UniProtKB/Swiss-Prot annotation:
Belongs to the phycobiliprotein family. InterPro entries: Globin-like_sf (IPR009050), Phycobilisome_asu/bsu (IPR012128), Phycobilisome_asu/bsu_sf (IPR038719). This is B-phycoerythrin alpha chain. It is found in: Plastid, Chloroplast thylakoid membrane. The keyword Hydrolase does not apply. Keywords: Antenna complex, Bile pigment, Chloroplast, Chromophore, Electron transport, Membrane, Photosynthesis, Phycobilisome, Plastid, Thylakoid, Transport. It comes from the Eukaryota. It is a peripheral membrane protein.
Length: 164
């Protein structure tokens, strides 16, 4: 699984060298931000059901046509699958926060997602809207500390950009 640490070590090993000072500074910065990332991961894990419901509800409010016949949310089973997918992405963001890198999203969430959604006639814009809602709804200090909010938002932005 890719993280800042594994990326630095892999690059150094591929070049047949020890990690450079800038490599070590990158790792040190990542470690210094770990407390904020873990705070964000804890808050997300503790509130994930509400986060997923609010994100999914916001998506269907913005894209009400998705509940029309022939669309991605035409029946309760398909609506539930959309919420399941939002939950899956939130879990991957949580994993990214824990490991301090985008490996989980890259490996389990983004690779091929656009092609799958296109094949199944599922608009990625709806998922982007639900993730953006979560990012925009975040309130510091109500939900988490400022630094934890920065870390959480960074991974949400990464996911939004990857699905856009």
């Amino acid at each position: 699984m890719k993280s800042v640490i594994t990326t630095v070590i892999s690059a150094a090993d591929a070049a047949g060298r020890f990690p450079s000072n800038s490599d070590l500074e990158s790792i040190q910065g990542n470690i210094q931000r770990s407390a904020a990332r873990l705070e964000a991961a804890e808050k997300l894990a503790g509130n994930h059901e509400a986060v997923v419901k609010e994100a999914g509800d916001a998506c269907f409010a913005k894209y009400a046509y998705l509940k029309n016949p022939g669309e991605a949310g035409e029946n309760q089973e398909k609506i539930n699958k959309c919420y399941r997918d939002v939950d899956h992405y939130m879990r991957l963001v949580n994993y990214d926060l824990v490991v301090g890198g985008t490996g989980p999203l890259d490996e389990w969430g983004i690779a091929g997602a656009r092609e799958v959604y296109r094949t199944l006639n599922l608009p990625t814009s709806a998922y982007v809207a639900s993730i953006a809602y979560t990012r925009d709804r975040l309130c510091v200090p109500r939900d988490m500390s400022a630094q934890a909010g920065v870390e959480f938002s960074a991974y949400l932005d990464y996911l939004i950009n990857a699905l856009s």
